[in-house]
Amino acid sequence: MSKIAIIGTSGLFPGSSTPEEFWDNLMSGRDLTGLATEADFGVDPAVFFHPEKGVVDKCYSLRGGYIRDFRFDPEGYELPAEYLARQDKLYQWPLYVAKEALRDSGYYQQKAVLDRCGLILGNLSFPTGSSHKQLASVYTNTTEQALQKLLQ
């Protein structure tokens, strides 16, 4: 196993855009969960809901930790700001978090050091409005094909 060093950390959580804010919220016992909205899923959340656990393709709770008040600043990246501003939040969030982790490391914009760096990301943000829009036709086609087979 290769040796690694964690040189910087960052995070984006419900009600918290830094690990420090997140820790403060945890320590003060704040509940930053809420019910899913159409803005979170891109469709009425009731479409995905079923009160019984274990029902295929359904969730039995719509309560979750949703990031809602974060405003992405598309300036200062190696891509055009107008392009980044149009991207889904699932692309914007990791860019923000990676940039903040690099700042935390003290090596932000030090190319010689960063050439030897990697990135580990975690994400629990599906479905989103954009993912629903992108995959709706796939779901529809798959469902139609399955129904046609069943009805033959």
Show where each model-derived region lies.
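Cys-dependent condensing catalytic cores that perform Claisen condensation/acyl-transfer
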Residues: 1-152
